[in-house]
Amino acid sequence: MLGVPIYPGAQFIRSYDAGRGQRYYIFGSAASFVDLVGFYRNVLKDKGELVYDVPATHEFDVGKYNENTMAFPPGVTIKDFQSDVSRGFPNPNPGGQPARFPTIIQIVPVVAR
């Protein structure tokens, strides 16, 4: 459905309207940032790019970006939410496990135009 694999065990959190007919999808994972980046490097056959060191954020481009028709470039972004100042991204499901996700996956699917 999204055009890229979802990391095994990742939990859907929410999708948002990105504008221009696009949506982005947020998933939480109990896996480490390093494990998620390794998974997506393998399945996408792309090394991606570390765009921020702190908090660690890694992006993979998965399609062509057309600034005339798209709000965001299609891609997969992995963000490390665990640090000295954060115990992780809160699980929005009451009583959901884990209580906090150390890592978040954001997917902007390829939209045919």
Language-model region placement:
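An acidic-aromatic pocket/loop used at catalytic or ligand-binding sites
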Residues: M1-R113
